[in-house]
């Protein structure tokens, strides 16, 4: 039997794309294996959000070269954002690569693989599709009994933040028809899903460009009506598009988890303007204030970039002050990495490397203390936990997540998977809590 090995890098959008890829190659008679050495077909689904992620892809491809030399019939494919960005250059850089499949072309992957099998043909397909075709083009995903699943509601991004490659590799915003979203949610619940995360580069702008479509807040309310669904999450949200209507959903919908990821990126107006974020510091803090007023128990995470071109010590201190005010439970922090094709790549990199690292370390230390305070505060609380499966610690425990998206490991029987159970948090670790079932 033919076999394939798939490795996924990057965001939740790529996770969904990979599930579609699995469905497509299984339709050709391929079965999944755990290592590239066993595979007849190797697929990398890639991320190019930062230079490091791109380098990682080429590093992996280098390790596959000896496999291709030993087995010339082996098919190697690269999908996703690096494929979209590099296109034909990938085939030139990696002469043993067979397929380069862009973000709009996953539906064509089965045909490309079949052609590579029969004719040893090499393929590059990275053309963007028209919006109407993209809107209805979602290949069937491989079935899964996982408790928590992602559902794509919008693709692409229209914001063109100056540092971000996403609009260049994912294209402009296109909302998926709400009827299709609801149909997929129902199907996944029938397969065993109890939690659905609605995803997109900017879910808040769902439906804004389609005259016949509902708002994202209205979509949330319809998803909440699906029988058998216990929890809803969504990501990612752009602060400038976070409406009062959407914020009110946190108070109105019991199924909506009390957590939001709201990337701020910087704390000073000058840097935010240079980033083309479309909001000010005060406007961002105003959204946070309203979220907490409407839903006092909500917790927030965020993204922050340090060392953006032109950033001053004073502007960095404004970011530190914003972290103190916002009190995120966690941040995903990065030192600025210029991406080719973005407008920020043309700006002078005028901040010394050691200064960037110093700022980054200070910011990380501050946030780690805030995070530690949250985790210690939670010890002793009894919280509803959706049980997702066996703990990744490999110690026979189960794991699940709180409404705040915090991982909890605890002792319990496997028949609890898929249920929401009360768990008392007993010990706090950096990335999880230990608990005991009540």
UniProtKB/Swiss-Prot annotation:
InterPro entries: Elp3/MiaA/NifB-like_rSAM, Methylthiotransferase, Methylthiotransferase_CS, Methylthiotransferase_N, Methylthiotransferase_N_sf, MiaB_methiolase, rSAM, rSAM_horseshoe. Catalyzes the methylthiolation of N6-(dimethylallyl)adenosine (i(6)A), leading to the formation of 2-methylthio-N6-(dimethylallyl)adenosine (ms(2)i(6)A) at position 37 in tRNAs that read codons beginning with uridine. It is found in: Cytoplasm. Its EC number is 2.8.4.3. Monomer. GO terms for molecular function: 4 iron, 4 sulfur cluster binding; metal ion binding; N6-isopentenyladenosine methylthiotransferase activity. Belongs to the methylthiotransferase family. MiaB subfamily. SUPFAM superfamilies: Radical SAM enzymes (SSF102114). It catalyses: N(6)-dimethylallyladenosine(37) in tRNA + (sulfur carrier)-SH + AH2 + 2 S-adenosyl-L-methionine = 2-methylsulfanyl-N(6)-dimethylallyladenosine(37) in tRNA + (sulfur carrier)-H + 5'-deoxyadenosine + L-methionine + A + S-adenosyl-L-homocysteine + 2 H(+). It is an enzyme of class 2 (transferase). Binds 2 [4Fe-4S] clusters. One cluster is coordinated with 3 cysteines and an exchangeable S-adenosyl-L-methionine. Residues 143-373 form the Radical SAM core domain. [4Fe-4S] cluster 2 binds at residues 157, 161, 164. GO terms for cellular component: cytosol. The keyword S-adenosyl-L-methionine applies. The keyword Transferase applies. Residues 376-438 form the TRAM domain. It comes from Syntrophotalea carbinolica (strain DSM 2380 / NBRC 103641 / GraBd1) (Pelobacter carbinolicus). Residues 2-118 form the MTTase N-terminal domain. NCBIfam families: miaB-methiolase, MiaB/RimO family radical SAM methylthiotransferase. Keywords: 4Fe-4S, Cytoplasm, Iron, Iron-sulfur, Metal-binding, S-adenosyl-L-methionine, Transferase, tRNA processing. Its cofactor is [4Fe-4S] cluster. This is tRNA-2-methylthio-N(6)-dimethylallyladenosine synthase. [4Fe-4S] cluster 1 binds at residues 11, 47, 81.
């Amino acid at each position: 039997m033919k076999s394939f090995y798939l490795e996924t890098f990057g965001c939740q959008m790529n996770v969904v794309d990979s599930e579609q890829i699995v469905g497509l190659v299984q339709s050709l008679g391929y079965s999944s294996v755990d290592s590239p050495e066993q595979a007849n077909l190797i697929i990398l689904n890639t991320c190019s959000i930062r230079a490091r992620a791109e380098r990682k892809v080429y590093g992996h491809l280098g390790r596959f070269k000896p496999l291709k030399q030993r087995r010339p019939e082996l098919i190697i494919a690269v999908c996703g954002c690096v494929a979209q960005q590099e296109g034909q250059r990938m085939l030139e850089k990696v002469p043993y690569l067979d397929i380069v499949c862009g973000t709009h072309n996953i539906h064509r992957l089965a045909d490309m693989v079949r052609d590579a099998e029969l004719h040893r043909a090499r393929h590059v397909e990275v053309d963007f599709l028209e919006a109407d075709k993209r809107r209805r083009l979602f290949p069937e995903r491989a079935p899964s009994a996982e408790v928590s699943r992602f559902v794509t509601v919008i693709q692409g991004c229209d914001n063109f933040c100056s540092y971000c490659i996403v609009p260049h590799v994912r294209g402009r915003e296109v909302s998926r028809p709400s009827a299709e979203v609801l149909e997929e949610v129902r199907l996944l619940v029938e397969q065993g899903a109890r939690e659905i995360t609605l995803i997109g580069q900017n879910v808040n702008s769902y439906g804004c460009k389609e005259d016949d479509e509902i708002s994202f807040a209205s979509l949330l309310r319809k998803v909440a009506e699906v029988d058998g669904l216990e929890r809803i999450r969504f990501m990612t949200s752009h602060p400038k598009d976070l409406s009062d209507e959407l914020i009110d959903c946190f108070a109105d919908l019991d199924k909506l988890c009390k957590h939001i990821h709201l990337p701020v990126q910087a704390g000073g107006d000058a840097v935010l303007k240079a980033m083309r974020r479309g909001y000010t510091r005060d406007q961002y803090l105003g959204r946070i204030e309203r979220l907490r007023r409407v839903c006092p128990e909500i917790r927030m995470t965020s993204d922050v970039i340090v060392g953006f071109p032109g950033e001053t010590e004073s502007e960095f201190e404004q970011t530190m002050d914003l972290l103190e005010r916002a009190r995120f439970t966690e941040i995903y922090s990065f030192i600025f990495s210029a991406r080719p094709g973005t407008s920020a790549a043309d700006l002078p990199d005028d901040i010394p490397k050691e200064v960037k690292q110093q700022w980054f370390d200070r910011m990380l230390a501050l946030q780690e203390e805030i995070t530690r305070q949250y985790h210690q505060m939670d010890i002793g609380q009894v919280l509803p936990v959706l049980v997702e499966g066996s703990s990744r610690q490999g110690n026979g425990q189960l794991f699940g997540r709180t409404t705040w998206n915090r991982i909890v490991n605890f002792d319990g029987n496997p028949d609890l998977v898929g249920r929401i159970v009360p768990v008392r948090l007993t010990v706090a670790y950096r990335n999880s809590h230990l608990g005991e079932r009540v």
